[in-house]
Amino acid sequence: MQQPTTRVAGPPGALRGWLDALAVVLAGFAAMAAVAALGLWLAGADDLPGGGFPAVLAGAVVLAVGGAVQLDGGAGQFAAVDAGISAMPLSVSLAGAVVMAEVFLRQLRFRAVAGGGELLGRIARTVVLWLVALALLTLGARHTFVVPLGGDLAQTIGGALGLTPEVGFHADAPSTVGIGLAWLLVVLAGTFAVSRRAPLPRALLPYQLAVRPAAFALWLVLLAYLVIGLAAGVLTAIVHGNARQTLAVLLLALPDLAWLAFGVGLGAQWHGRLSGALGLPVPRPLAEVLRAPDGQQATISLGTLADQDARSWWLLPLAAVLLLAAGFLAAYRSPRTVRLWQHAVRFALASAVTVLLVGLWTRADADYGLSVLGVGVGQGGLGDLIGSLLGGANPLAGLGSGSLTLRPVLWTAVPLAAGWGLLAGALGALLAARTGRRGEVTSGDVPGGEVSGGKVPGAG
């Protein structure tokens, strides 16, 4: 009886290759737009005047891929708004990254080993279409709002003085395209580093055993923090009310807060400052620390958060337990031939890279101010400005100075993460060795087929 043939996919044709790349790009943008739209709707942005919601949605996606949005406008000849926002809504970013990775991998699902030329071709086509999409996105992320002054008398006086308040925004094209390209490359690199389904060229197959176990384990740590943060956010919405705005924070910035907690639990620090109103609820200890007196720079650390809420000390054992579990899992999925010191070093490097990326992703800068005849006025905040656009009675009342800055101290955070990773990797390897489960994995679990005796030494 004739045996059924097994389908083996070959390199895509030119048209199929471009369609595959288009599917990856469109899927990513669709996922980011859906999450951002729901989050903005919950935040109240659906009430923006002048049909500005689509442009604001495009601006949110611009920020999600690492771009920047500039605010501008003013009130005739007398006042001007000078502002800029550069902060990643990581819930939106994560949605796009996960969907793009899944679509990219599904196109390679019949591969055991992929040729280097084919993978580079797929990546190059995706990059080209991604850059085109980013350029179009920057065109859509611009809008100007004409803000009413209020009653008839205010309108009359404003017209006589030449006060025609307008507040607009536009995406910064160079940063959006440049950083957006880097964002895509990081997503694709992470996909190949984490997923066992991602085929590699034969020359790179030996290296996957050194990278994938640790990368996958730390990815699970980040996901665990998201689950914990989601549970805490939902509980807060139920107990303390304000459910709509709390859910908006979860849909826009859950990873920003959860992964910040991960870094703080490891001993990392962030420097920041907050003046004015945020507009959306954030954990009270974080907001209190950022509101340093006299506008001074604040330090976000385990100690400063615990000064506001003693429960913050739980971030330390939480980070220790999850990192130790990740070290065990990485060793459990590694080959028997990997020595303890090798596993510890690999896990230390992976931990350092993870915290480096978390630090870069959680940076935030949002500054604006209204000047009248060159002199800054007002004590409002960024939340007041946004609130006025969402229906406030007197928009000019909120056009004061406001800022939010958040920057990681990477020169201490990265070495700390490496030290934690070294310890967790070594202890994890010892625990895995006691289980007797480190070692052989069947060849079907690893792209590349059989190796000596039908088995290969473990896989990530």
Which positions does each model-derived feature cover?
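Selective recognition of specific alpha-helical transmembrane segments in multi-pass small-molecule
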Residues: 26-34, 126-138, 217-233, 353-354, ...
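Long, glycine/tryptophan/cysteine-rich extracytoplasmic
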Residues: 4-95, 139-173, 233-319, 357-444, ...
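Alpha-helical transmembrane segments
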Residues: 169-185
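Long, low-complexity, intrinsically disordered cytosolic termini of multi-pass membrane proteins
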Residues: 445-460
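Cytoplasmic membrane-interface segments at the C-terminal ends of transmembrane helices
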Residues: 3-19, 97-124, 138-146, 185-217, ...
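Loop-centered beta-sheet repeat module
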Residues: 201-245
